[in-house]
Amino acid sequence: MCHLLLSTLLIVLWAQTLPINGCIDGERRALISFKGRIIDPANRLSSWEGRNCCKWQGVECHNITGRVVKLNLRNTNDDDSALNGEISPSLLQLRDLMYLDLSSNDFATSVPSFLGSLKNLQYLNLSRTYIFGTIPQHLGNLSNLKYLDLGNMKSEAIYADNLNWLMHLKSLKYLDMSFVDLMDVSNWLAAVNKLPSLEQLLLGVSGITIRSNSLPHINFTSLKVLDLNSGIALNTLPLWLWNLTDLAHLDLSYCSFKGLIPHELGNLRSLNTVLLRDNDFKGIFPKALNPLCNLTNLDLSYIGFSGEVAMWTKELPSCNRNILNVLKLSGNNLNGSLFGWLEKMTELVSVDVSYNSLTGVVPIGVWKLPMLTKLDLSNNLFEGVISEVELSYMKKLKELGLSANNLTVRVPKDWTPTFNLLVIKLGSCRLRREFPSWIKSFTELTYLDLSNNAISDKLPSWFWNTFHNLQNLDLSNNQIQGRLPVLLQFMALSNLNLSFNQFEGPLAPLPESLTSLDLANNFFSGSLQIPNPLLNIYTLRLSNNNIVGTIPISICKSPYLSLLDLSNNNISGEVPACLGRSQALQILDLGSNNLLGHIPDSLCSTGMPLVIRTSNNHFDGPFPSFLKQCTTLMILDLRQNKFLGILPDWIGESLTNITILNLRNNMFSGSILTQLGQLQYLQVLDLSHNNLSGSIPLLANFSKLSSKELEFNDDFLSYEMSGYYMYYMVLVTKSEELQFSKTSLLVESIDLSANNFMGEIPEFFGKLFKLQNLNLSENHFTGKIPSNLGNMKSLESLDLSMNDLFGEIPQTLSKLTSLSYLNMSYNNFSGKIPTGDQLQTLNDPTIYIGNPYLCGPPLPIACFSNSTHSYHSDNENEGGLLSVEWLWMYIGLLLGFVIGFWVVCGSLLLNRSWRYAYFNMTDNLFGRFNVTIALLLAKLCRKK
């Protein structure tokens, strides 16, 4: 009886502790405190009022205890709804909290270490926020944690020193640390191997090193999803991978693995997704895929395979050809046609075979694939005509890519499609000159490429207010006319390319959502004042227009601006100093304007520019000292300005990544310092048309010009290959001023012409095997041509004209098999012109004009056998030695004079009668001359 009373009393006391309003008062206050430190721009937490916190949005409580067990504040809307502020430690009052999701918000703080004290936490998601700093070791205290997502942070400054804390999370099933910097973590694999319950591991773009070593024992064999994309691979695929027999999803994209795809891959029979994009595999299509009967998603893009595409597809699993949903083979060197294999894969949803060498017409069976939503055939060699007949079969199609083939798309103006495309890529598809009105039906369009189609129409009025969801628009390389409408600013565009058209008028208000804008090569005029700020812009190209005025300060308000190209306009004034403080700026091109003053000296203090081009302006002053900080600089083009003074010695010590250095047409003076030879990546050096003097020092460290292989800066190549920027390099080669664009990084040139250099031509030039152009003309070089110049196998143009060179032209120059231009004019060369091989084709006599002691073809002067013409400058041998022919000529003249003199004068001296007769005759002639003059004067006087 006593026990019954005691039990009843305990139940009553326990019932009194339960929350009357369904919420623990202390936890309600903790949530209010948490809200107090949060900025809520969209008022998402407006429901956080009243006594019962269990009814607040994002809050869930235990049905019995009333304690908060779940807090889900994930932002599922746009960025304008993101919470920001601080994550308050008041969350520690939620002692039973098992689920915490703060993802996709804008919390700008480090990972709170106090989260490691929430012992009951099973789910923690902080992904897609601005959280930064080191991941705290305290997270290792969450022994009940099953789900941890720290991936895809909006900031790029979250990292881990080690992952030892991870070993304590024995219950963990899901781990996402994508985009977390793990480059310094060497024990990541050992830590993961301590997690026996792990089913999903995502470490993409984390900088981890993937070694090919094996593990003594594999503990994480329950793994079903493995994402290591963009890891650093040291060799081939790791051996421990083949023990993960439950693996269903494997992503090893962008890892640079080499060699063959191992046959052990076929042991992973549970695989349904294999993503091996962007690796360096070789050989034929892997037979290892044949046993994978569950395979539905296969991506083998950009892996270096080649051969007949039909032979490849024979190696696909025969047991699953009718269940494969996604097939991506783009970016290889596949050839052949689509006949006989593609139309048989009836379950295909997405096909991408772009950027190959596939040929033939597109089979009608491909257009009839019933499930197809994406078809990308771009950048191949397909041919034929695509009409509305073929397109009408594709009822479910959402993405269509036909760009850059030999295809012709012919669709009637009044055709109404039976499907609704989201992506259209019809670049270079020979569309009609009229703008295609049939695309008006695709109101949900997000991507439109109609570039390079010779469209010469105006954009219809419906265009700008139809595609409200359009994010990418490329109409470049057409002949489209008109002005930009005001409606443009209301579109959702992210990338806009209208370059190489005939648009005109002032710049209109632009969408604030723009990240890339290309209006180059049009007829836009007016000032550069863009009516609204472009806060999200990354690349901005307005080159080759008629823009005037100054560069506005408002352009400095674009914090992400990495590429600014305003070249070839009529912009004047000074460059705003604030532009130099743009931290993201990598490419600055202000060439061919009317700018003056100085380049902002803060340009390299915060950013890491790759290209600075200010050529053909009116900048002045000494060589910019701020460039000493530009250690990442790859291209420096200061050509045709008013810079003066000496070149500093730190150029070779600080600009260690420079590839193109163009200082042509300035007023630099002094000599070239030896430190310039430290520029080991230099490919183009142009110091021509300055006042430089002295001799050429040893520059033998130009290893790029002497190496057998070329290496390029990946960051710069990404701009060129994407089409965002094209550096136009102007060089004088083969006596012509030429412009190089896409091939600018393939040119190797040294131009020191039109200076005051003296001394001998250094022999190190002969070691620059990759050099294509060498111009030393219009200087004061002396001595002989080094014979080792014949080793410059890549040399195409050699100009040594207008110097003081002498001696014989070396026979070794005949070994220059690539030489197509040669100028030796106006020197003091002597002897026979060498013949043979490539020199035989250079038969223009003007090549050697101004060298009077040269003989032999192509000159009309024949060489005497066994005779050698030589000339030595006064510097080498004062007085000189005359040739035999000239010596005899002078002797003959002297003898003739002596003989003639004594024949006349000697006779008069020796014979008296001859002498008297001679002088008598001269006296008579003189007398008659005087009488004649006197008579003429008398007649003139009488006439007056």
Pin down the residues of each PLM region.
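Plant-biased, solvent-exposed loop and capping regions
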Residues: 1-944
